[in-house]
UniProtKB/Swiss-Prot annotation:
Entry keyword set: Cell membrane, Disulfide bond, G-protein coupled receptor, Glycoprotein, Membrane, Olfaction, Receptor, Sensory transduction, Transducer, Transmembrane, Transmembrane helix
Main localisation: membrane
Functional note: Odorant receptor.
Superkingdom per UniProt: Eukaryota
A Pfam family recorded for this sequence: 7tm_4
Membrane-side (Cytoplasmic) residue stretches: 53-60, 124-142, 223-239, 296-315
Localization annotation: Cell membrane
Membrane-topology annotation of the record: Multi-pass membrane protein
Glycosylation, residue list: 8
Name of the protein: Olfactory receptor 5A1
Gene3D superfamilies: Rhodopsin 7-helix transmembrane proteins (1.20.1070.10)
Length: 315
């Protein structure tokens, strides 16, 4: 059954999002906090994209992937943050059935695309460290473009499968989602249909895309560590370790929180705890990613310094 047909057959045409709290004082504090996180996410990721595009020294496969990661992080957080922030001003926080399905599809699609992109980035680092002389011939512009396109296509096709399996179900009420956006566990809990097949589909998608990506990342970083130990110069080892440490930090944060939420049975869902975890992987991680890469990356710092020096000259 398609999502449109499911919408027509369901007695529920819209959902009510409970958000975080009903206390006005806490709502004001949370609004300011989340607005600050979202604006920081936009500022840092956009700055990183423009910095990479504007500096020819950063026109390499590694930074091509990094600029796409920043773009995904902007879209990923934007699937949740704007709607969540406006909901603070409404007594009844409603979202249509189709709007809920669209939010879920876009959010999960961007999240799975990021998982696949991080796998491509790990392969890029492995090629750079293990075969530095052959690296330019291995990581060609065409291959990098195909890897990025493949990440988006794979992510959104997987998301389409997940969204179709959930929103084809019948929803007859209640329609109250005890969450701040249309995430999988709280939406699935509202269905009047048997959700076993949907849970199996979700498990298979998460294991196939997320689990396989995580396994490939572990294998890649195993080879990378082995290659780093063979680098003769201490400076070369330090530079390689610095770059890989940034990647590993991002991978651990994203996969750790996402797999925790999406690979558990719906019966183990705890509202308060899982809302905090959801805030972390939907809002905090997209803000931290550019900071992690920027603060530990000499080339990014040098490019930023050039921009600041240029502004001083023209001011």
């Amino acid at each position: 059954m398609s999502i449109t047909k499911a919408w027509n057959s369901s007695s529920v045409t819209m959902f009510i999002l409970l958000g975080f709290t009903d206390h006005p004082e806490l709502q004001a504090l949370l609004f300011v906090t989340f607005l600050g996180i979202y604006l920081t996410t936009l500022a840092w990721n956009l700055a990183l994209i423009f910095l990479i595009r504007g500096d020819t020294h950063l026109h390499t496969p590694m930074y091509f992937f990094l600029s796409n990661l920043s773009f995904i992080d902007i879209c990923y957080s934007s699937a949740v943050a704007p709607n969540m922030l406006t909901d603070f001003f409404w007594e009844q926080k409603t979202i249509s059935f189709v709007g809920c399905a669209a939010q879920f599809f876009f959010f999960v699609g961007m999240g799975l695309s990021e998982c696949l992109l991080l796998t491509a980035m790990a392969y890029d680092r492995y090629a750079a460290i293990s075969s530095p002389l052959l690296y330019p011939t291995i990581m060609t512009q065409g291959l990098c473009t195909r890897m990025v396109v493949g990440a988006y296509v794979g992510g959104f096709l997987s998301s389409l499968i997940q969204a179709s399996s959930i929103f084809r179900l019948h929803f007859c009420g209640p329609n109250i989602i005890n969450h701040f956006f249309c995430d999988l566990p709280p939406v699935l809990a509202l269905s009047c249909s048997d959700t076993f097949l949907s849970q199996v589909v979700n498990f298979l998608v998460v294991v196939t895309v997320g689990g396989t990506s995580f396994l490939q990342l572990l294998i890649s970083y195993g080879y990378i560590v082995s290659a780093v130990l063979k680098i003769p110069s201490a400076e070369g080892r330090w530079k390689a370790c610095n770059t890989c440490a940034s990647h590993l930090m991002v991978v651990t944060l994203l996969f750790g929180t996402a797999l925790f939420v999406y690979l558990r049975p719906s019966s183990s869902y705890l509202l308060g705890r899982d809302k905090v975890v959801s805030v972390f992987y939907s809002l905090v991680i997209p803000m931290l990613n550019p900071l992690i890469y920027s603060l530990r990356n000499k080339e990014i710092k040098d490019a930023l310094w050039k921009v600041l020096e240029r502004k001083k000259v023209f001011s």
